[in-house]
């Protein structure tokens, strides 16, 4: 902190225990809080660092701050498994960044905690004291299990959907005199045909009206000049703006989908800008690894587009031919199943008579001998 500029920011990765252990660590926490240095504490998932499974935090420190509160973020639930470790996804990181930048209170995720509250807790900064990110306990209704019906509290738990689709709840359920509900027949048809659902779908389509043209303008028309390093953020902001006012859709799930595609898109754009527009038409050998003489060897197996995959070209310019090939492949697969069934239905005596056209295991036909036999029929 001493070496920071007045407006400087320092982040430290620490084990979770520094937030609540006593002794000198408790004294350090007290001094940091009283001198208004702790801007945010971000709890990370366990097991995200190789070699250790202990939970960790990121502590954000500032030398000078205008506010005296501290943002507590519990990001321990946002991760995916990656081998033996956990891994933060791009969407998880973006959620953390946005919450910290906005210093936002988000239920079960983050909370601004006053210095007075921290004092009352004797400078204990253990994250669960301030943010409860635990799942709601699962409950079982014995009456419903024995006599049927849906408890009202289970339907109430879906309140975000009833708020997004007004009137749908009443159309889906009949409430019995005992207070339990019965779902009406064909709920999928009720949902898909309900006015509030149709309105939601229309609002969603309207929000993304022109999105394709926006992408074409940014990524196709300007592919040779677009600033690749800035473009993902521009696309993200556009998507977030379009999703404003659209309930139920997790904007960070949408960002994750964009980011996963952007990894490929950005590489393509950089290649076009480096090699020129004609690289879009270039093809390269498609190399695969095959066993040869007991060793793995890389060999060419056809060709592939350097930028545009062949399957996109085929589906766009030759849809009828692609459909015909798919139908032939389906027929071939069906014929193979029928041949297998035919072999399975043969008796041992039949297999002896057909030994010239069956393999050594008598479980499949040999193509060449079988074709020769058919010629003589």
Regions found by a protein language model. Give the residues of each.
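A conserved structural/catalytic subdomain of Rossmann-like adenosyl-cofactor enzymes
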Residues: 1-374
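Calmodulin-binding IQ motif helices
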Residues: 377
């Amino acid at each position: 902190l001493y070496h920071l500029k007045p407006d400087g920011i320092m982040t430290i990765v620490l084990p979770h225990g520094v937030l609540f252990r006593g002794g000198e660590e408790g004294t350090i926490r007290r001094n940091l809080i009283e001198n208004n240095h702790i801007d945010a504490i971000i709890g990370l998932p366990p097991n995200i660092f190789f070699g250790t499974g202990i939970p960790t935090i990121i502590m954000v420190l500032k030398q000078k701050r205008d506010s005296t509160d501290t943002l507590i973020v519990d990001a321990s639930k946002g991760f995916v498994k990656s081998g033996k470790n956990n891994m933060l996804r791009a969407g998880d990181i973006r959620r953390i960044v946005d919450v910290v930048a906005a210093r936002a209170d988000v239920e079960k995720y983050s909370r601004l905690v006053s210095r007075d509250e921290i004092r009352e807790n004797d400078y204990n900064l253990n994250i669960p004291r301030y943010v409860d990110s635990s799942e709601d306990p699962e409950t079982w209704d014995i009456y419903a299990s024995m006599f049927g019906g849906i408890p009202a509290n289970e339907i109430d738990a879906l309140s975000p959907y009833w708020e997004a689709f007004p009137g749908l709840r009443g159309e889906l359920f009949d409430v019995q005199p005992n207070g339990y509900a019965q779902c009406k027949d064909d709920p999928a048809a009720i949902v898909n045909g309900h006015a509030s659902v149709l309105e939601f779908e229309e609002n969603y389509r309207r929000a993304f009206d022109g999105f394709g043209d926006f992408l074409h303008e940014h990524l196709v028309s300007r592919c040779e000049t677009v600033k690749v390093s800035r473009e993902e953020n521009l696309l993200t902001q556009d998507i977030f703006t379009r999703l404003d006012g659209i309930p139920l859709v997790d904007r960070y799930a949408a960002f994750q989908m964009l980011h996963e595609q952007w990894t490929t898109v950005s590489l393509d754009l950089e290649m076009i800008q480096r090699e020129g527009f004609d690289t879009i038409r270039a093809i390269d050998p498609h190399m695969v690894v095959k066993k040869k003489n007991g060793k793995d060897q890389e060999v060419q197996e056809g060709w592939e587009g350097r930028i545009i995959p062949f399957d996109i070209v085929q589906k766009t310019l030759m849809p009828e031919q692609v459909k015909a090939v798919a139908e032939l492949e389906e027929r071939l697969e069906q014929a193979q199943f029928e041949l297998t069934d035919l072999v399975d239905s043969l008796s041992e005596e039949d297999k002896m008579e057909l030994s010239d056209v069956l393999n050594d295991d008598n479980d499949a036909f040999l193509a060449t001998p079988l074709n020769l036999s058919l010629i003589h029929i």
